[in-house]
Amino acid sequence: MKAGRAFGCLFWALLYCVLYLDLVSGNSADDELMDFDFADSNDAAMEDWQLDDLEEAKKAEQAEKKLESNMLDFSVDLDEPEPEKQLPPFDWRERVLRNALAKALADEGLRQKFAEVLPILRMLSSQQRLALSALISAQMNAKKGHELKFEQVRMMFGNEKKLLLPIVFDIANLIKSSTRKYINLGSDLASSALYHTPINRREDDLTPEESQQDDQLGTIAVEVEPKKVSTEEVQLESLEDFFDEMGSEVLDPQMINEALTGDLHDNKTKTFKPENHGQRVRRSANEFVHKLTRSVPASVTEQQLLGGIAGRTIKLNTTAFQQPSSQEEEKMASSNGGQSYSEVEDLAFAGLNGTEIPLSADERLDLQRNSAEETEEPLPSPEELIAGPRYRLGKRPLPGQKSGSPIKRKRVTSSLRGRPKTAASSHKPVVTPPNKKCERFTSNMCIRTDDYPLEQIMGSIRRHKNAMSALLAEFYDKPNNNLEFSDDFDDFSLSKKRREDEGSAGGMCQSVVRYARPQKAKSASGEWKYIVNTGQHTQTLRLEKCSNPVESCSYLAQTYRSHCSQVYNYHRLLSWDKVRGLHVDIFKVPTCCSCQVDGYRQQFPPLSSIQAKDYSPQSPVINHSHNGYSTINEEDLDYAEESEEDELGLRYPSFNNRETNELYSSSNKVRVKLPGISSSVGPYLSPPDDDEDRYGGYKSSSSSSKKYYSQVSRRRPQHSEARLDLDLAPSETHSDQEPPPPQHHQHHHLQYHRPQEELPSAYDFHRPQVYQPEREQLPLVRDPALSPVSAPVLASPAPPLPMPPMPIKQVPSHHQAHHQQPHHHLHQSTGKVAANRDPASMHHQPPRRPTQQWLPGQRRPFRPSAPLSGSGISRRHYHNRRQSIQ
């Protein structure tokens, strides 16, 4: 037993030693593996597999070398100097474009074009230059026949007017057309350095098995014999590869997305699989994809900007606008015909209150699939709009440009009036004749139309339920929009021509008022668009159209020339078109029919042109500028356009009672107009011969007085002068019975409180001036010293009896205070003389019996003559005052 146990212990000890030695030898082998070179893999493969056939080993070695030559090498040794690859690719591409532009400028015609464009380039802002660089890159990257159209550019940039898209688009097309034919990558040093190695690799031939394997894996355009390719094709291929590899580096990151979507990166990486490809082959260039990154949409407000929407980006893909390159793509584009304006609708409704739109491509696809499931029936394609040509699809020729253009665009000419529209899935313009039935209310608005795209509009509304609910919420939140319209409401027109109050005579212009929901209208920009009026989403307008737009107005005097004119207002309405989908636009809506009076502003200037002065008894300007011929500014009166008989009373106000003047002082709208007598005064207002000295020197600077007296012929009273003398002239006994007022300085104050019994005295001073000298004769007898001074100043050459001056200077106390004023005040304003000569200020004088030189019943013949100048009157008044003071 003991021997067996000893043998067992020895066995386990030996086993432990063997295991220990094995472990030690294993660690040394691991240390040797740290220095193993995997590059020398041929010997290891031969030893492992124990290949006996040397020829098969050589073939396998050649195949592996060929496979390595066609593999993409991602291992870059940073220590190895490569001067041709140290510079950024953008610098090389910039140099290529610069060299091409320098060659293009050798042409005299192109130099002339760029000379005209250079001033515009200097004045462009930073955003406009970024847009220009983006368009230049887009047009240079695009294949022939796939260039961007102006409609696509407008949708990409949001149709912002600040970017000057038409000018920037033309400049980009000019640069593309002038430099593209001069770009030769084979001759350029930079391009040869970039493309020298890939071209040598393409010369390697593929075995049939490798080419078949590459075709099965999805490699495009495998060429087994690339040496037979012509030089022109090689040049075109290099040009396409050059612009394909330019990518987004040429485009500014502020205008174009800095990083492409993940799908594009995955597609590029899946195309080149080093473990499956036998050789790197030339692949055809992909369709041009231009994605515009807008950090903040145009419809986002400042509140939403602060709320966090500014950090989200919306990418607009314009691949749907270009012509597909295969039949499968055409089928996909035809099945998804609404993709073009649906994306534009997403941008348009991004700024509505409480609206969230999916920003990723997957979420958009899910939303479109859900909306397609809800609408089981396929939506038909909408009809084209009726409008004139507004945007030119082709490149606009610059001044001096030849008719021949390198880019030929297809145009469809039609004798009918129409505008070519760019379809969503094709670049070919389609012209539709404007022969659709339309119930027009005006030339720019249709109440009903046969081509109303009801299904398309309803589909857009269903796709944007949140946005439409936000619109309805904003509508119902307003206090005046709580009215619910029934579904059976169509539109109605009033039975009357115009809504009028009871008892009114009617409108001055006949018009038709209609409450309707129009279906199509021309926007303020000149484009015909459909107005959303479907289901619960209605937009009712009050429309009023003149029945006789150019005819004269009714209920207006025949002396006025007038005409009826249509008045328009601008309304913001939710509209729909094929390009943009649902959006808000501005429309010109007829809302009123107005009566316009011709020449009214010329004859009656507005109140702003006349300095408004309040009438008050203490106003020195009003009191000193009154004469017997003051009138009323009829444009300030509410009854200025009444009959001519009423105007007679307005021109003869009551100076004793001053009742009308009290109305003037209390009203801000009515003022007294105080013109002087001009040379065009009618004969019934002309003063007598001797009174011309008193009134002839007052020349008013107001132009409205001349306009007033120029129309005196139609406002002349119907009574004759003899009738006026008998009716308006008081008797001498009546004048004797008038008690004189106590003081002159209280004259204006007492006039406001004078009873109605003194009404005839008001007409006494507004009767024809032939009777006024009756009261002016007696002071000549009391003070005969005045006659030799004033006799030579008379204007009449041979009057029957000399006209004495007025005896205003004989009034005690208050007149002497006026006489002691300095002499320059007398010449400063002729209105002060008018205050002393005003007949209304002379009724307080005691009546005097006329002398035997002048009889009460004697009349003098009326002889109008031109008034004298104001200098003679001032001189006469000055001498009269000097003698009265003495």
From Swiss-Prot:
<dbReference type="GO" id="GO:0021556">
    <property type="term" value="P:central nervous system formation"/>
</dbReference>
<dbReference type="GO" id="GO:0008045">
    <property type="term" value="P:motor neuron axon guidance"/>
</dbReference>
<feature type="glycosylation site" description="N-linked (GlcNAc...) asparagine">
    <location>
        <position position="267"/>
    </location>
</feature>
<feature type="compositionally biased region" description="Pro residues">
    <location>
        <begin position="797"/>
        <end position="807"/>
    </location>
</feature>
<feature type="region of interest" description="Disordered">
    <location>
        <begin position="675"/>
        <end position="754"/>
    </location>
</feature>
<dbReference type="GO" id="GO:0005615">
    <property type="term" value="C:extracellular space"/>
</dbReference>
<feature type="signal peptide">
    <location>
        <begin position="1"/>
        <end position="29"/>
    </location>
</feature>
<protein>
    <recommendedName>
        <fullName>Neurotrophin 1</fullName>
    </recommendedName>
</protein>
<feature type="region of interest" description="Disordered">
    <location>
        <begin position="369"/>
        <end position="436"/>
    </location>
</feature>
<dbReference type="GO" id="GO:0008063">
    <property type="term" value="P:Toll signaling pathway"/>
</dbReference>
<dbReference type="GO" id="GO:0008083">
    <property type="term" value="F:growth factor activity"/>
</dbReference>
<dbReference type="GO" id="GO:0043524">
    <property type="term" value="P:negative regulation of neuron apoptotic process"/>
</dbReference>
<dbReference type="GO" id="GO:0045087">
    <property type="term" value="P:innate immune response"/>
</dbReference>
<comment type="function">
    <text>Neurotrophin which may function as a ligand for the Toll-related receptors Toll-7 and Tollo. Binds to Toll-7 and probably acts as its ligand in promoting motor axon targeting and neuronal survival in the central nervous system (CNS). Involved in synaptic targeting of ISNb/d motorneurons and also some SNa motorneurons. In larvae, involved in the negative regulation of the tracheal immune response to bacterial infection perhaps by acting as a ligand for the Toll-related receptor Tollo. May be involved in the normal development of specific neurons at the neuromuscular junction.</text>
</comment>
<feature type="compositionally biased region" description="Basic residues">
    <location>
        <begin position="874"/>
        <end position="886"/>
    </location>
</feature>
<feature type="propeptide">
    <location>
        <begin position="30"/>
        <end position="498"/>
    </location>
</feature>
<feature type="disulfide bond">
    <location>
        <begin position="546"/>
        <end position="593"/>
    </location>
</feature>
<dbReference type="Pfam" id="PF16077">
    <property type="entry name" value="Spaetzle"/>
</dbReference>
<feature type="glycosylation site" description="N-linked (GlcNAc...) asparagine">
    <location>
        <position position="623"/>
    </location>
</feature>
<dbReference type="InterPro" id="IPR029034">
    <property type="entry name" value="Cystine-knot_cytokine"/>
</dbReference>
<feature type="region of interest" description="Disordered">
    <location>
        <begin position="321"/>
        <end position="340"/>
    </location>
</feature>
<dbReference type="GO" id="GO:0005576">
    <property type="term" value="C:extracellular region"/>
</dbReference>
<dbReference type="Pfam" id="PF24103">
    <property type="entry name" value="NT_N"/>
</dbReference>
<feature type="glycosylation site" description="N-linked (GlcNAc...) asparagine">
    <location>
        <position position="317"/>
    </location>
</feature>
<dbReference type="GO" id="GO:0048018">
    <property type="term" value="F:receptor ligand activity"/>
</dbReference>
<feature type="region of interest" description="Disordered">
    <location>
        <begin position="789"/>
        <end position="886"/>
    </location>
</feature>
<comment type="subunit">
    <text>Homodimer; disulfide-linked.</text>
</comment>
<feature type="compositionally biased region" description="Basic residues">
    <location>
        <begin position="815"/>
        <end position="827"/>
    </location>
</feature>
<dbReference type="GO" id="GO:0031637">
    <property type="term" value="P:regulation of neuronal synaptic plasticity in response to neurotrophin"/>
</dbReference>
<feature type="disulfide bond">
    <location>
        <begin position="553"/>
        <end position="595"/>
    </location>
</feature>
<feature type="glycosylation site" description="N-linked (GlcNAc...) asparagine">
    <location>
        <position position="353"/>
    </location>
</feature>
<dbReference type="InterPro" id="IPR056200">
    <property type="entry name" value="NT_N"/>
</dbReference>
<dbReference type="InterPro" id="IPR052444">
    <property type="entry name" value="Spz/Toll_ligand-like"/>
</dbReference>
<feature type="compositionally biased region" description="Low complexity">
    <location>
        <begin position="698"/>
        <end position="710"/>
    </location>
</feature>
<feature type="disulfide bond">
    <location>
        <begin position="509"/>
        <end position="564"/>
    </location>
</feature>
<keyword id="KW-0732">Signal</keyword>
<keyword id="KW-1015">Disulfide bond</keyword>
<feature type="site" description="Cleavage">
    <location>
        <begin position="498"/>
        <end position="499"/>
    </location>
</feature>
<feature type="domain" description="Spaetzle">
    <location>
        <begin position="508"/>
        <end position="597"/>
    </location>
</feature>
<dbReference type="InterPro" id="IPR032104">
    <property type="entry name" value="Spaetzle"/>
</dbReference>
<dbReference type="GO" id="GO:0005121">
    <property type="term" value="F:Toll binding"/>
</dbReference>
<keyword id="KW-0325">Glycoprotein</keyword>
